[in-house]
Amino acid sequence: MVKITYPDNSVQEFKDGITPAEIAKGISEGLYRNAIAAEINGELKDLNTPIMQDSTIKLITLDDEIAPKIYRHTMAHIMAQAVARIFGEDRVKLAIGPVIENGFYYDFDIEGHNLSEEDFSKIEEEMKKIIKEDIKIIRKEVNKKEAIELFKDQPYKLELIEELEEDTISVYFQGDFYDLCRGPHLPSTGYVKYFKLLSVSGAYWRGDEKNKMLQRIYGTAFPKKEQLDDYLNMIEEAKRRDHRKLGPKLNLFMLQSEMAPGMPFFLPNGKIVLNELMAYSRQVHKKYGYVEVETPQIMNIKLWHQSGHWDHYKENMFFTEKEDMPMAVKPMNCPGHILIYKNNFVSYRDLPIRMFEFGKVHRYERSGVLHGLFRVRAFTQDDAHIFCMPSQMEEEIIKVIQLTNEIFSTFGFKYEAILSTMPEDHMGDIESWERATDALKKALEKSNMEYRIDEGEGAFYGPKIDFNVTDSLGRKWQCTTIQLDFQMPERFDMVYADENDAQKRPVMIHRAIFGSLERFFGILIENFAGEFPTWLSPVQVSILPVSEKFNEEAKKFSRILEQEGIRVYVNDSDATVGYKIRNEQMKKVPYMIVFGEKEMNSDTINIRTRKGDTIENVSKERFIEEIKNEIKNRNLDLTF
């Protein structure tokens, strides 16, 4: 007999080999119909998994948070089966088909056919047939020899099988289709009916440009139609907000893939926004006791050997050599900050030292993964390093969390925290890692922050906290990182003198709030759909003279606004007022003033907002004061 412990800690005994499906049926017919998988001793398993020992169990239904990982994985298999049916099993070579955020994909190598979105309708129809057939999904475990025989005509699967160390390999069957997979999967193909194929693209096998280019189909799936509809509407809205379209359109930035791939050019309007972001960041950092520094772009490669970046990061670095000195373009700012620290004698009275830099870094990314401002090769970090005594580190991390909260609240962002622990490829001893991880946990808990743990995803030199912000479309973006580091101070022999003049090792905290200024800029463009709050808007007020005779007075009024620190543009073209209004609305200028006889001869104006609202008879003095306050307070919403 086996003892089964439920989430409410109640215990029930069953015969050896009982399955979660049988347990669900014993509880209620409704639960049996709705269950799709089970969490057994913390691991996701199929409903038909035999339980041979005392275990904890949680039955998973379509409403559970983990459910999308299961049903979208099955949908990837259904799509692969449909593609094989349509184009022929002998012509379709299967690669991989994982679940990703909000969806899934599958990579194919199809002889004699290039997939396009025109193929989607017939693939979707075949998928619907497979779903309607409600084919049972069966997991079988085979040895390596049997797996090789099963997949003898599937070269990509064979490559994966050959690399597996274990001899027991799981294969999932649905009718005449089978795939190499760890699972778990739905009990049958009929459980989830609402899906959509989204796009097709090229993808190198295993992400290596030296390998063959495969064809990747992306899709998504939901248990309810309204959930799918909401997601598809969100995708359409995201396309409208795409920073790669809005950026050039609003004169913010441009990309030159031929001349400088992954290295954005910032245009006049974009530079204004970046300068505002940096000015705000400097103001907040000064408040929290940081000093700003600047470090060189190119430094001797021996620095990167000493820091450990050479061993862990050289494939992502750029190099040059002059006067027989091999140099590296910095991929990170931390070694430079360490050299500044070591430039002077440091006493315990000097600590903590909070060193801050807008540091331009360069990291090689494959051309295939470059993506607007989100994935680039050159970017600016709002990078800081805090050097402190071990007794100060918890308090310093709490202060970084407070600083992060202050900055994100200014942009209206909510965020979640993820604690990432020691990866396999790491520096230093386990005891130091445990001490660092514990300090991060305590800081989060004392800050009353909920967090989840991401095992094995820390940096090579220390555990970290990542903060993911949620934008206006509900999408999550990783921005802030806080990393605790005992390794770099050791490698660089960093010391401070304690109260007894004994040399002690400081702790180093790495942190960036925006993360990358470029990436954060892209997030802001999409979050606000280009309609920045007034304080960030490149042009804050546009004045639109009704005709040429009002141009001079309009310019006089613009100079008054400029003297008050307001960014103004006067559209003195010969175009009609209606055209001028439409043009400024397309530029997403917060406020427009149509300037005619009344505006020239009185102290009142009519204000038009980019949303199309009109506010009449506002005194010029009041307008100026209200806009100044809106800018000073960095309000998210328009005052008028």
From Swiss-Prot:
Record's keyword annotation contains RNA-binding: yes
Purpose of the protein: Catalyzes the attachment of threonine to tRNA(Thr) in a two-step reaction: L-threonine is first activated by ATP to form Thr-AMP and then transferred to the acceptor end of tRNA(Thr). Also edits incorrectly charged L-seryl-tRNA(Thr).
The encoding gene: thrS
This enzyme's EC code(s): 6.1.1.3
Matches recorded under PROSITE patterns: AA_TRNA_LIGASE_II (PS50862), TGS (PS51880)
Biological source species: Petrotoga mobilis (strain DSM 10674 / SJ95)
Protein name from the UniProt record: Threonine--tRNA ligase
CC cofactor note: Binds 1 zinc ion per subunit.
Subcellular location: Cytoplasm
Statement: the UniProt record of this protein carries the keyword Cell membrane: no
